[in-house]
Amino acid sequence: MPSPSPEASSSMSQPGPPSRSPSPASSNPDAPEASHNKTFADLGISPELCRACASMGFKKPSDIQAEAIPHALEGKDIIGLAQTGSGKTAAFSLPILQTLWENPQPFFALVLAPTRELAYQISQQVTSLGSGIGVRTAVLVGGMDMMSQSIALSKRPHIIVATPGRLMDHLENTKGFSLKSLKYLVMDEADRLLDLDFGPIIDKILKVIPKERNTYLFSATMTTKVAKLQRASLNKPVRVEVSSKYSTVSTLLQHYLLLPLKNKDAYLLYLANELSSSSMMIFTRTVADSQRLSIILRRLGFPAIPLHGQMTQSLRLASLNKFKSGGRSILVATDVASRGLDIPLVDLVINYDMPTNSKDYVHRVGRTARAGRSGKSITLVTQYDVEILQRIESHIGKKMTSFDVDKEAVALLTDTVAKANREAALEMRESGTGGGGGKRGRDKGKRKTFGDGDDRDRDDDVVEAGVPRKKNKFTPGGKKKARK
């Protein structure tokens, strides 16, 4: 094994070559059951990293890991198609760490992620896998102090995990920072990156990094945009496809609940009460409803907490950690939380709002029934959502079953919910988070607070990097918001 360069040897541990270690002996908790009997050592992973896999509970490679790692170790570009929860992070991290171990240098690899939470999660897993070789990582995301991130960059990390917007800010504004020596580029959740309008920023990033590099692109689907990005950024890639169709696992019980739109909140309260022993995630389409419903549930005695892209980064991480640790059993979230995040032991997913496509549905309900465990999902379906429900059922190849409720019990909750809704609207107005009584008031609050009439929860890094918001036809005062 080659010796490290003088610059890196002082910061990256380099023990002598050990003997072959035994195969890891515990289970890989977040990847689906593999369809092979290979070990990480069989794939060519070094004993040091095999031990790291074992310490993290990875018994054997997942299918995406078994398919991608050998090609990556041969130095090939890879496009990997696999669903969330398939073990993609280790699939690209292990080959990078192994090559880094053999030739340590700063700014060795860059991983682009669509959301801040996913960026932190990737960094944590990379750090854990590379703990035995002293890997240094830095996370660059919006909502956090630029100066502290600049200090982290001055320590010359081996691997950077970033959202595209904040990375571009540092490339343009942080003195002495460049990626001219970069050896690896990873784009994780590429379809989500492009859905969030990061395409123009990624184009800029591709222009300032070396053309001679290894590139890994991982995506749940091969969309037209992803195919275009592949052609622009990868060189003769090997295509690794674990699943070509969106599907849900057999251990997930999928239900729908047909209800009138006007009573939606009462039905949600009924479910929260009847299933109160469950750890649950409630998905909303808008930031305002995530905030509003969490307030309503808290006022009625339920341990709920919101998670959406308009919260500060510290609040987002605090919400996520409280839910993961069991401090709160209900997380009311937008689609910021639907992909990639490792949230163990979610018993129930409730779709308060219908996802607009099958892809988002699969990602949402994929937060439960992970790693062979059972789980349940309930999708609230109003009279306006029936066609969307049928499309989703057709796409996933499964029929959902109707969830039975006591309609008389629901009716008894309407006055309680209406009062809590008024109190939530008042709290949101007083705290400056928008709101007003009823749907019209809530819509008005959303326009006032969240600005652009676009009710998708888009990560702030898009705006920070200068990409205009969709449907943003009017900005009060006509002034462009400065980057953070």
Swiss-Prot record:
Q: Which GO terms describe its biological process?
A: maturation of SSU-rRNA from tricistronic rRNA transcript (SSU-rRNA, 5.8S rRNA, LSU-rRNA); rRNA processing
For bias type Low complexity, the affected ranges are 1-14, 22-34
Which ranges belong to the motif DEAD box? 188-191
Q: Which residues form a coiled coil?
A: none
Q: Which InterPro entries match?
A: DDX47/Rrp3_DEADc, DEAD/DEAH_box_helicase_dom, DEAD_box_RNA_helicase, Helicase_ATP-bd, Helicase_C-like, P-loop_NTPase, RNA-helicase_DEAD-box_CS, RNA_helicase_DEAD_Q_motif
Q: Any domain commentary? A: The Q motif is unique to and characteristic of the DEAD box family of RNA helicases and controls ATP binding and hydrolysis.
Functionally, this protein is described as follows: ATP-dependent rRNA helicase required for pre-ribosomal RNA processing. Involved in the maturation of the 35S-pre-rRNA and to its cleavage to mature 18S rRNA.
Q: What is this protein called?
A: ATP-dependent rRNA helicase RRP3
Look up and give the organism this protein is from.
Cryptococcus neoformans var. neoformans serotype D (strain JEC21 / ATCC MYA-565) (Filobasidiella neoformans)
